[in-house]
């Protein structure tokens, strides 16, 4: 391989290492295509700078441990429902209709308890589904190595 192509190949490989993998989740009988965010880079990027999120799409943030979580909407351009799930994938907290934030200071949306999984959906989805605390989240697909 030519040395002049090596930097481009390395860049592409590094971007792929931080890309969110895809699968699906089911919540209250509704299935959503999902992107898994399992490392610091993909969790930090989240749904930033996206101009839309389909009604049947989501992002699932996966962490290695249970602890109180807090999300913010910095550079997120669309309102979201933020749902927090414990290690058993039971819904423990909801922050509904979290609004976009383009400049500091941005509001913080904390969980009300320990969470290992955080699901972001298009704002209004949780209400339409009639979600209640204790709901179970089913995950299909391999999220990859959680770091």
Outline where the language-model segments fall.
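Bacterial N-terminal signal peptides that target proteins for export
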Residues: 1-6
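N-terminal signal peptide c-region/cleavage motif recognized by signal peptidases
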Residues: 14-17
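Compact, glycine-rich, soluble single-domain proteins
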Residues: 20-147
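General helical structural elements
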Residues: 7-8, 47
């Amino acid at each position: 391989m030519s040395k002049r192509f090596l930097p481009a190949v390395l860049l592409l490989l590094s971007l792929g290492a931080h890309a969110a993998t895809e699968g699906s989740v089911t919540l209250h009988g509704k299935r959503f295509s999902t992107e898994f965010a399992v490392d610091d880079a993909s969790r930090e990027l989240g749904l930033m700078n996206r101009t839309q999120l389909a009604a049947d799409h989501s992002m699932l943030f996966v962490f290695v441990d249970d602890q109180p979580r807090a999300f913010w909407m910095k550079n997120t351009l669309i309102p979201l429902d933020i749902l927090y799930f414990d290690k058993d994938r039971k819904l423990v907290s909801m922050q509904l209709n979290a609004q976009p934030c383009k400049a500091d200071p941005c509001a913080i949306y904390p969980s009300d308890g320990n969470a290992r999984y955080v699901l972001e959906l298009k704002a209004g989805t949780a209400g339409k589904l009639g979600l209640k605390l204790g709901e179970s989240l089913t995950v299909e697909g391999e999220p990859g190595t959680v770091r």
